[in-house]
Amino acid sequence: MINISFPDGSVKQFAQNITAFEIVNAISMSLAKAAIVVEINGELKDLSTVIENDCKLRILTAQDYECLEIIRHDAAHLTAEAVKELFPETQVTIGPAIENGYYYDFARDKPFSIDDLANIEAKMQELSKKNEKITRELWDRDKAVEFFLSIGEHYKAKIIASIPEGEPITLYRQGNFIDLCRGPHSPSTGFVKHFKLMKVAGAYWRGNSRNEMLQRIYGTAWATKEQLDNYLFMLEEAEKRDHRKIGKELDLFHFQEEAQGMVFWHDKGWSIYNTIEQYIRKKIRKNGYIEVKTPVLVDKSLWEASGHWAKFRCDMFTLETDDKTLALKPMNCPCHVQIFKQGIKSYRDLPLRMSEFGLCHRNEASGALHGLMRVRSLVQDDAHIFCAEEQITDETVRFCKLLTEVYKDFGFTDIKVKFSDRSEICAGNDEVWDKAENALKTAIEKAGFIYTLNPGEAAFYGPKIEFVLTDAIGRQWQCGTLQMDFVLPERLDANYIAASGEKKRPVMLHRAILGSLERFIGILIEEYAGKFPIWLAPVQVAIATITNDLNDYALEVQKTLIDNGVRTDINISPDKINYKIREFSNQKIPIIAVIGKQEQANKQVTIRKLGTIEQEILSIEQLIAMIKKENSNYL
C-alpha cells in the first residue's frame, strides 16, 4: 500500500501502481469527470500517470488557474489535428501555450486564408464534440524519427533528433492525430470548448531568420465561455483605444520609415509629454532629488568598464570618430556614477538621489517596434539613489510612497508588486544578498504592498521589485522598477567616506516610476481612450462662437486664457455651432466654451464638459480659477 497526502491534510492508502485517475475516481466520480490533471509532489502530471510510491497529490479542474495553460496546450493540438484533417499536405512543427492563448506553426506552400481559419475553427469544434481520448505514449527514439519521416513530418523528426540522449520521447495521440509533446494534457478533447482562432502570421523555423518561413496560427482558449467573451470584448475595446489610432485622430504624433522607432511629436502630443515631465519634476524635487543631465554619446571604454558593452553591445548604436568608438547610451546609470565620483563623498551626503530625463537609444529589432510602446529613442524618468546599506529599507519605503502617489494621480490604483530574488549566478556573497533581499521585503511590507515572488529572476547584481498597473480594461502593464545594485559602484570605483573614516562602496538603487515617457504616454492614451483629464489635456478649453459678429470677443477671451496659462483652441469660422461643438467633442477637449450675444454682453462663457450635456455659465475669471485649481493639484 502507498500513502497519498492531500492538500487538506488528509492521508489515504491505496494499492501500489494505481493511476491518478483511479485515485480521483475512488474519491468522487463527479470529480473524476471534472479533473484535468493532477499535481504530484509539485509537478503537473496526466491523470493516466501510475503512482508507485508515497506522494503529495492535488487534483486540478478547470477552476484552477494552472489548468488554463493545459487547456491552451490542448487547443494547440486540436488546431493541428484540424489542420491535418483539412489540409493533409501540411507539416506540423511546434505549438506552445502563451499568454492569453497559444500558437501553432505550420509548413505549407499555400498561405492560410481568412476562410481557412473559419473552416479550421469549425473543424476544431467538431473534434471537441467528439471528445476524443488523449493518451500519452512512450516511444523509442529511432522508431519515433522513422515514424514521423514516414508520414512526411520532417520537422518533428528534426525536433526529436535535437532532444538530448537519455530524455524520454513522449507522444500524445487523439483520434487519428499524434504529436510529439512533453505534456501533460487533459484526458480528452472535450475539455477544450471555449476557443477562437485569432490570426495568421509569419514565423521563422526555430526563430532564426536564416531558416524557412512558416505560418503561425494564433488562437485563444479559456476555461469558460464567460472568460472567452470577456477576453474578446477586451480585445475589441483595446482596438478602439489603440494609441496609434487615437494618436493620429488627435494629431499627437506620428512615425515614418526614415526614422523607424523614433517619435515625431506634434504640438498636442508634445504638450502632454512636457506636462508629464513638469509633473514628475515637481514630485521628485519635493522628495529630495537633484536633477542632472548627462551626455548622449559616450566612449565605449565607459561601457566596457560598466559591463554594458559585453551584455548590450548588439542593442547599442555606435559610431567611429577620431579613432574612437562612441555609443549612444542605452541607459543612464554609468553616467550618473561619474557625477557621484566628482569630489569626495561623505556618509553625510547619503542618500544622494540623482534624477535625469535621460535620452536613451536602443537598437530594437524593426519587427519588435510597436508605436509608442516599443521605440528606439526613449526618455526615462530615471533616477539612482546612492545610499548606505542601512538606508536601503527607508529609501525603498520612500520610493514606494512616491510611486503610489504618482500612479494615483494618473488614475491607477490597482498596483501589483513582483519581487525577484537571487538566481544561481549572482555577484556578491550570500550574506550580502540576504541583507539586501530582507531589506527590500521589509520595505515592500512597510509600504503596504503584498508581493508575489519571482524566484531566481533577479539580475546578477541585485534583487529587484517590479510594479504592475492594471488599466481600465483589465490589461496589466509593468512600469515601475526598483533594482538594487552592488556591482556597478564596484566596477566604476564609486565610494564614500564612512563615519569611521574608512572608504565604503555605496549601494546603488536604480528606480523608475513611469519607465519610458513614450511608453507611459501610450498607456495613458489607451487608459483614457484619448479623454485626458483637464490638467493633462493638450487643449483644456475650446472656444466656439455662435455667430461671426462675436469673433472679436472670442479672441479677447482666448488671449486672456492663454495669458493665464490655459491651453486653448478656438473656432470662429462661419460653421454652425453644433458642428463646432461636435468637432471639439471628437477631439476630446475637456471643456467647450460657447460664446453667444448674452455671453458677450455679460463678459461670460457657457461651458460644457466633455461627455455631459449639462451647461454652466461662468465669468472668464471663474473659468480661469477652475482650470488653475485643477492644474495646481498636479503641477
From Swiss-Prot:
One of its GO terms (molecular function) is metal ion binding. This is Threonine--tRNA ligase. Keywords: Aminoacyl-tRNA synthetase, ATP-binding, Cytoplasm, Ligase, Metal-binding, Nucleotide-binding, Protein biosynthesis, RNA-binding, tRNA-binding, Zinc. The keyword Iron-sulfur does not apply. Catalyzes the attachment of threonine to tRNA(Thr) in a two-step reaction: L-threonine is first activated by ATP to form Thr-AMP and then transferred to the acceptor end of tRNA(Thr). Also edits incorrectly charged L-seryl-tRNA(Thr). It comes from the Bacteria. Zn(2+) binds at C333, H384, H510. Homodimer. It is an enzyme of class 6 (ligase). It is found in: Cytoplasm. Residues 1-61 form the TGS domain. It comes from Rickettsia prowazekii (strain Madrid E). It catalyses: tRNA(Thr) + L-threonine + ATP = L-threonyl-tRNA(Thr) + AMP + diphosphate + H(+). GO terms for cellular component: cytoplasm. The lineage of its organism: Bacteria, Pseudomonadati, Pseudomonadota, Alphaproteobacteria, Rickettsiales. Its EC number is 6.1.1.3. One of its GO terms (biological process) is threonyl-tRNA aminoacylation. PANTHER family: THREONINE--TRNA LIGASE, CHLOROPLASTIC_MITOCHONDRIAL 2, THREONINE-TRNA LIGASE. Residues 242-533 are annotated as: Catalytic. Binds 1 zinc ion per subunit. Pfam families: HGTP_anticodon (PF03129), TGS (PF02824), tRNA-synt_2b (PF00587), tRNA_SAD (PF07973).
